[in-house]
């Protein structure tokens, strides 16, 4: 599907997937605009702290059953970290275990100043990842 941008894509995904009370795991920090999109669809947000390597997957909660997880793995916004392949695999395994989707906003993935590009989450699990 082609949209006018990430905001429209996230709004459409939220309207399609979310019902009042559904849980969404988000990176912390993340923009207020993204939080508002999910809240407007009735979601309860659960923030996962971010470090220099993106979302800290060791902190994914065992007691939550999210509808989806929102992440910016190639260039975490606003801090800029890139999620290493080990964490990407952990995130995919968690989504399989909890039967949730991963919403991958591949913001700035094409801009690399060092090293080879890291595989997108969607490339690692195309059936579970919604790629924006």
Predicted features along the sequence, with ranges:
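Conserved core of the PLP fold type I
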Residues: 1-99, 110-111, 116-130
């Amino acid at each position: 599907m082609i949209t006018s941008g990430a905001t429209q894509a996230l709004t459409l995904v939220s309207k399609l997937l979310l019902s009042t009370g559904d849980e969404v795991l988000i990176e912390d920090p993340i923009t207020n605009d993204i939080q508002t999109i999910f809240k407007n669809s009735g979601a309860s947000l659960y923030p996962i702290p971010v470090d220099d390597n993106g979302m800290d997957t060791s902190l994914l909660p065992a007691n939550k059953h999210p509808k989806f997880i929102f992440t910016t793995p190639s260039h975490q916004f606003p801090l800029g970290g890139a999620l290493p392949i080990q964490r990407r695999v952990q995130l995919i395994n968690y989504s399989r275990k909890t039967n949730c989707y991963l919403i991958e906003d591949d913001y700035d993935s094409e801009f690399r100043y060092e090293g080879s590009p890291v595989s997108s989450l969607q490339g690692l699990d195309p059936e579970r990842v919604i790629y924006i």
